[in-house]
UniProtKB/Swiss-Prot annotation:
S-S bonds: none
GO BP annotations, alphabetical order: riboflavin biosynthetic process
Family to which this protein belongs: Belongs to the DMRL synthase family.
Residues noted as binding 5-amino-6-(D-ribitylamino)uracil in the record, renumbered to the chain: 14, 46-48, 70-72, 103
NCBIfam families to which the protein is assigned, alphabetical: lumazine-synth
Enzyme class: transferase
The reaction(s) this protein catalyses: (2S)-2-hydroxy-3-oxobutyl phosphate + 5-amino-6-(D-ribitylamino)uracil = 6,7-dimethyl-8-(1-D-ribityl)lumazine + phosphate + 2 H2O + H(+)
Keywords: Riboflavin biosynthesis, Transferase
Subunit structure: Forms an icosahedral capsid composed of 60 subunits, arranged as a dodecamer of pentamers.
Taxonomic superkingdom: Archaea
CDD domains with a match to the protein in the record: Lumazine_synthase_archaeal
Protein's name in the database: 6,7-dimethyl-8-ribityllumazine synthase
Originating organism: Methanocaldococcus jannaschii (strain ATCC 43067 / DSM 2661 / JAL-1 / JCM 10045 / NBRC 100440) (Methanococcus jannaschii)
Length: 141
């Protein structure tokens, strides 16, 4: 039996030139893996992701959530604060809702050029989401 995996995407619009490329690579990989992207929510930035992730996790037809974002280093430590807090809360939500939430967020501490070289983080996050859903379902059988 083939397990259909339904995904929700939460995408940051900050650094949209990069997150758009990440989103497209992620969509293509989801299709390649036979997963369906049921919902996409675009939020202002990575820090804003947890609430959107929570709303998607509450949906019965979402098996996992993929986060897609890019945090580029600035002149302060703001990028580190944003990524660390978002990642912590995203992980907490996965445990709270008992569904995978994958981290397709590049950064902190990277330049714009490094961010462009890491657009495959969206693909990796989709891969991890699909694997986690399938492996967790296998545990239930």
């Amino acid at each position: 039996m083939v397990l259909m995996v339904n995904l929700g995407f939460v995408i940051a619009e900050f650094n949209r030139d990069i997150t758009y490329m990440m989103e497209k690579v992620a969509e293509e990989h989801a299709e390649f893996l036979g997963a369906t992207v049921k919902y996409k929510i675009v939020v202002p930035g990575v820090f804003d992701m947890p609430l959107a992730v929570k709303k998607l996790l509450e949906k019965d037809d979402v098996d996992a959530v993929v986060t897609i974002g890019c945090v580029i280093e600035g002149e302060t430590e703001h990028d580190e604060i944003v990524v660390h807090n978002a990642a912590r809360k995203i992980a907490d939500l996965a445990l709270q809702y008992d569904k995978p939430v994958t981290l397709g967020i590049s950064g902190p501490g990277m330049t714009r050029l490094q961010a462009q070289e890491r657009v495959d983080y969206g693909k990796r996050a989709v891969e991890a989401a699909v694997k986690m859903v399938k492996r967790l379902k296998a545990l239930e059988e």
